[in-house]
Curated annotation (Swiss-Prot):
It comes from the Eukaryota. This is Protein SEY1 homolog. Pfam families: RHD3_GTPase. Residues 31-277 form the GB1/RHD3-type G domain. The gene is SEY1.
Amino acid sequence: MDTKTQIIDYDGNIMEDLKEWMIRNKLANLGFNYNVIAILGSQSSGKSTLLNNLFKTSFDVMNTKLGHSQTTQGLWLSFDTFEDSSAGPSEQGSTTRKVNPTLILDVEGNDSKERGDNRLTFEHRSALFSLALADCVIVNLWYHSLGNFTASNYGLLKTVMEVNLELFQQDENCPKTILLFTVRDWFEEFASIDIVKNKIVEEYLNKIWTEMKKPPEAEKVNISNYFIVEVVGLSHGIIKKEEFLKDVENLRQKWINQLRPLQYSRNIPSDGFAHYCNNIWNTIVKQSQLDIPSQKEMLATFRCQEIKNNVISNASKVIKEKLAASSSQHSSTSIDEFKPWAEKEVVEKSLDEYFVDASRYTESICLKTSEELLDSLFIQLQTIVDNNLNFTQRVLAAKFANELNTMYSVCASDKNVFLFSKESNLQVRKDGKGGSSPSAGDKKDTKDTRSSQDKCIRLWSSFLLNADKLEYNTLCKFFEDYQKCNIEVKKRNKTHEFNYKPSLSILSTAICKDLNRIRNAQLTVLLDRTRATIKSRFKNMESLLITTKNPEEYWNHTLKIVKALQESINSNLTKCFINLKGGGAGPGSITTAGIIPNGGLYNDEDNTFHEDNLVEAHNSLSDNQTGHENDHYVEENLLNFHKIDVIKNKGKYISTVGEEIDKQVKNKNAIAELNSYYLDEIMDVLKSKLDEISDNLSSIIIQRFESVFNYDDAEQPRQWREISMAELKKIFRESKNYAFLIIDILQKNVQVEIIDDYLPNNFIKDEIVEKGKNKAKRKIQEMCRDAQYIQETGAKMSLKNVPLFFWVILLILGWNELLFFTRFFFRLNIILPLFLAAAVILSTLVFNGNMEVLSIINKAVFFLAKNSFGVYRQLQAMGGKAAQGAAAD
């Protein structure tokens, strides 16, 4: 294992592998439990040899046999873990304490002839670097050089003290640096160590301190405020080697038990030591002002960011695994399990991992970076929260649509036409909710059809209110699930609330789309039933055409139907149309976004109602719902956020949809436009009915002709054989004129209010009129010829004209043949058909001239005759079997 490494080379470049070296030697996780010693002194003064004996290091030493030369170039770093030593008895007992490792910095010797005149720059930099890092600076000097300037390191001491003041003058809590003077080749016989120490302190340190140019605030400060001065004498390493080794061992124990700080005095955690060295050296080389507190802050920022990134990297793996699991299988349990998992497995675990190392650095920076860590974790956790909330919103949106569909399924299944009641549902109830509902007695008395109709009308009249309440309940459930996702950060004593707005926007949009879809579907059902009702009121238009005698009568009657329909629809269905279609100029002008989210908040403390001002911005009318669909979604989202605020504040949500509907009911312009819409629908159905009548014009003309031509004033069938030819022609002319009067009626050559705005005079095309007239003329002429034929031949064909004696002679002469045929018929079992034939003859005599009745009788007789043959065959077979059985007996 490489127990030493060069951190700064001869050219003054800092090496980049210090961190890896510390990690390999298990020095990066010591926290503050380590120390740093640097040694300064003249070149070839035995610094590396002293360190090797004192701390069991392996720095390169000079081979004197090869001559004096520079051995240590730049700065080298090694360590001693003191595994063979202990810190001695503890205060509480005889147990020994483990000794913190010490990093040993071997600095290139000063006064080097190899560097020449450039040595001062490197010496100053290395001294500054050593003082910035070391708890203890060893000043290595020879005893016999104490009176010299260069050899005694007087200049080096001055540099050390100036640099130390430069470094720590701004730090009120600056750590004291241990200045350990190792006096080499010292003999007790020369002078005691106390005299040597006094000489060093008085003639060197105090003198230098007095002569130094100090800032005003340090003028009266004693040198002891910055340094702890220790002097140790070491015997000659060659002449008295055993004593030298003994002195070194004593110094080792003194370091372990007395001089060594319990923790690194520079307050740099070991994991940031390499980066701190890099920053310090680069600042020194750039000849910038070396500000130790700023350097510590820079290091704290760097290390806290580095620790934060490592923690985030570890947490990201856990979050990704959870995200993959939650994406593959969504359920309500995943939402319930999220909060404890996120709090313990992600947030608390990450904070604990972060503070293990980061807490050693500047507190303010550590805490600030921990907030950044939390923010980063929350951003990643937001993805899982979004997944959970998106699952929730999909379930809730589907539930909303299903419940609303189920609520209105009865309306979609009922296809009956409306049986309008006289009571109007436009009345506003005193409770402000609008609408009217039948009393219990009325419900018992109404029929099933009317009961179903009333139920549908009540549902349609409160569609927006029901949807609003259902939407609010949906948002309450959404917010309940959202609150399960919020995380409590116990170490911060706060709760983090995730962003729910994207999921709420999706939910609001889905609700709005489903609401409009169901609303449009119900509007279609309402329109279909309304049109069917209108059509049923116009079903007698054809019958009226057959009996009406002038255009004024026909169109006045039609106008009464139109007005009655308009009034009935307005009285019974206006609230339905306001809810499903909207009031105003165009479809959807009363939109879901404009009314549904319009709610208020009751404050439980003062019971006062606070109306949201946003509502006023969403009551405007629109001519095209499709063109503003996106705007409606935006409005829906904004107002649903308002509902969430109501839920957050635990207030009472009071829907004002009923009040908005009532305002529309009282709005004369809105009602007028709805009435215009009703009239448009009524007239569309009327036009369709008139088009249908136009297509069947010939049939109606013929029916009008038959109603006069075939029946007299008493509505009895005419007996053409009793009517003369002149009278027949007169009846034909009157019937024809009456029949073709329908054309003048349909062409509406009269002034009729309301209807004139939709149907112009002569609205039936001439081609259709001519085609119907021609077809009707042919049929009328055919009917007239039939009447003439009956008139001419009816009397001759009558059996009443045959003389009585003819029947007597026929009976006498045909008696035998009559008996023969009678026996024959009974033998063949065809007596029933004969009776049927007789019935035909009889009916002919009775209903002579009534062609329709005769036709019906003939068809009935033919059917009975056709089916009676098989019956008699079966009876004949049964009779034959019975005869055979009797013969056998």
